[in-house]
From Swiss-Prot:
HAMAP family: Fen (MF_00614)
The name this protein goes by in its record: Flap endonuclease 1
Residues the entry annotates as binding Mg(2+) 1: 34, 87, 159, 161
Gene this protein is translated from: FEN1
UniProt lineage: Eukaryota, Fungi, Dikarya, Basidiomycota, Ustilaginomycotina
Species: Mycosarcoma maydis
InterPro entries registered for this protein in UniProt: 5-3_exonuclease_C_sf (IPR036279), Flap_endonuc (IPR023426), HhH2 (IPR008918), PIN-like_dom_sf (IPR029060), XPG-I_dom (IPR006086), XPG/Rad2 (IPR006084), XPG_CS (IPR019974), XPG_DNA_repair_N (IPR006085)
Amino acid sequence: MGIKGLTALISDEAPGAIKEMEIKTYFGRKVAIDASMSLYQFLIAVRQNDGQQLMTESGETTSHLLGFFYRTLRMIDYGIKPMYVFDGTPPDLKKELLQKRFGRREEAREQEEEQKDVADAEKMDQLARRQVRPTRQHNEEVRHLLKLMGIPCVIAPSEAEAQCAELARAGKVYAAGSEDMDTLTFGTPILLKHLTASEQKKLPVHQVDLAKALEGLQMTMAQFIDLCILLGCDYLDPIKGIGPKTALKLIREHKTLENVVHHLKEDGKKSVQIPDHWPFQEARKIFESPDVQKGVDLDLKWEAPDVEAMVKFLCQDKGFSEDRVRKGCEKLQKSLSQKQQGRLDGFFTVKPGSAPPKRKAEDDKKNVKKKGKK
């Protein structure tokens, strides 16, 4: 889920913190990617023309393997050195959220069964995607594939995005790659969004700079963590009646969540409902002191790929086209064998504009309205 409304808030209050970049900008960079988020995305997005997941003849899902194989090749093609971090044991505070997700999947499964004779194909496809749940087998297969590709992997003690942030802070990688904005809350200096997006979508990479975000929001890291909790995160629901702008105003005025909660209780507005059990201190502790392996202790090594083992796994075991897999392996070998050139920062151009397209479009509309008033 990430942090509700955080991207829009940063776009409005700290537009210089978000830049649209071309993927080639990251030539020579090491990036820690949230594998658990990518796994979920690939299981949902990588589909056949009829909307069904890719499968072997025996019915085993292979969408996740196709996604990781080709998206990783794409990054390596651009000179990026990706490594992947997988989720470990979730914090106790996250169990309620996971139970809710399980409930939504069960609800979608029941709806699909009830409507299979009357619903249209689009509705059935939506219900099917809502039932997606990565399994232990999916995770193990992806780690096996990445090992054969020579790509380093780490299993985090707990949250993958927290471990990605730790690696970035330790200087082991340039940035963390994830779609979850809470990677910023865990303290990554640089967050890259859309790095593993499909090439067909032609999405630019959104680079978010934490220091610039804090500067624009006019707050410390501790206050930023409190803001993210107030907005709504994976560990606590937001307070009903408190939107992003109000949350920002409250943290700026009252500095801490303790003071904000005290103020809201004193204020007594009926439209604002603080849950009876809202352990924000526990959520804060997860963000401030996450369960991670120290970045300095991790030795990340990119190895030569095992082509024949990859062909056996993907083609003989999973039914992939051998011709396409071997061509992909040739690309992988070529990219990894080439001597890494040094980075010349500024050599590649940044795509114009510092805010995501949606925000820029909204700004353009506002400007048109202002001109009309003159």
